Amino acid sequence: MMGDLTTSFPATTLTTNDQPHVVVCSGAGMGHLTPFLNLASALSSAPYNCKVTLLIVIPLITDAESHHISSFFSSHPTIHRLDFHVNLPAPKPNVDPFFLRYKSISDSAHRLPVHLSALSPPISAVFSDFLFTQGLNTTLPHLPNYTFTTTSARFFTLMSYVPHLAKSSSSSPVEIPGLEPFPTDNIPPPFFNPEHIFTSFTISNAKYFSLSKGILVNTFDSFEPETLSALNSGDTLSDLPPVIPIGPLNELEHNKQEELLPWLDQQPEKSVLYVSFGNRTAMSSDQILELGMGLERSDCRFIWVVKTSKIDKDDKSELRKLFGEELYLKLSEKGKLVKWVNQTEILGHTAVGGFLSHCGWNSVMEAARRGVPILAWPQHGDQRENAWVVEKAGLGVWEREWASGIQAAIVEKVKMIMGNNDLRKSAMKVGEEAKRACDVGGSSATALMNIIGSLKR
């Protein structure tokens, strides 16, 4: 089987002309899809000018994925779409539906060569989600595969270490050479359980990171300097390929938020707090009410994206009923309660002066590009380590003791982040560094240009 697959892509068939043909393979969920759409858009445009095939895993889970994919191909007619069908297992009680989809992708990745071999012109390289690492690196060893991780460099280090971590105790901080220790509270509990569904496919793919041509990270040199230096020194994990920061990637342009932008235009500069916990973080009704009462007491203008279900199509809640008439009216006097916004448009508005965030990595990079300070409220997964990175880089502060009865803490922290001039200056400095990194001649732009240049030789 392997012999048949590898002979489909002998090294001599790789394209060597001035327009490399690259395949971009995204994972599942908006947290994975968004950076891959940004990458595909960048690679198809100047100065990279690649022929791009974008692989879409079918079926999709959320309405947001469907909407963004449809919009993307409408605005990028030169990018070829390749659907890759996987079999989704039946829903299981207490198992994250996204984990089930991640596993189905990982288990199906070995079938990709059959689909890729039919593409024309021949492929120069693949840029893939980590879920495809084992399948691609074992069946297509002659084809350069750049694993693109959708989290921070620091959390990627932890993922790479999971094969060792799953054998260790969760009672003490995890020490990885060259890096500050990882507190156990920051590490997802499943990482200590090799039988957990997420841990099992993470281990399967992490073992094959060494066969990737490189590890691409949506971060930049000055944001995670110690981690990037340690990873590339060989002291942290000796068998990793080069770890290359290529961010923050330019985001796609969307239609402006007609309902919110006029309201924002009327607010004083840096006076609005943007509140969002991402596409996969659903809060309980009690948490939502606590946060709502805290925001109301803070007397701060805000835009709040309220989410009560992990999967958007399952979110049937009515905001007025959720908050109750009295609190809903009070909140509506000070801000906007919505189900969805164009986040990059909101963060880029001059009226927005702070971001109460779960610290999903896409949100962190979008705030970093614009120098918007973050008040971190991580919920699960990589978010606690991402919050650690945010605080260390000077982009925000991390309140580590959020709990029930948080109204007073909300009031205190919101006032702190909206009125802290030192933090605002620090965040603006991060924004300037992010802009330099992704501008022509910057460290991230140059790194990606060097990769594409190597495919033309």
From Swiss-Prot:
Tissue note: Expressed in cotyledons. Not detected in flowers, leaves, roots and hypocotyls.
Positions that bind an anthocyanidin: H32, N94, G381
Positions of the catalytic residues: H32, D129
How changing Q383A affects the protein? Decreases affinity for phloretin 3.5-fold and affinity for UDP-glucose 3.6-fold
Gene3D superfamilies attached here? Glycogen Phosphorylase B (3.40.50.2000)
Q: Name one GO molecular function term.
A: 2-hydroxyflavanone C-glucosyltransferase activity
Name the UniProt key words of this record, in alphabetical order: Glycosyltransferase, Transferase
Checking Pfam families in the record gives: UDPGT
How does its activity depend on thermal conditions?
Answer: Optimum temperature is 45-50 degrees Celsius.
This enzyme's EC code(s): 2.4.1.360
Free-text function comment from the UniProt entry:
UDP-glucose-dependent glucosyltransferase catalyzing the C-glucosylation of 2-hydroxyflavanones (2-hydroxynaringenin, 2-hydroxyeriodictyol and 2-hydroxypinocembrin) and phloretin. No activity with flavanones, flavones or flavonols. Exhibits C-glycosylation activity toward 2',4',6'-trihydroxyacetophenone and phloretin using UDP-glucose as sugar donor. Can use UDP-galactose as sugar donor, but catalytic efficiency is 14-fold lower toward UDP-galactose than toward UDP-glucose.
Q: What is this protein called?
A: UDP-glycosyltransferase 708C1
Which species is the source of this protein?
A: Fagopyrum esculentum
Q: Which gene encodes it?
A: UGT708C1
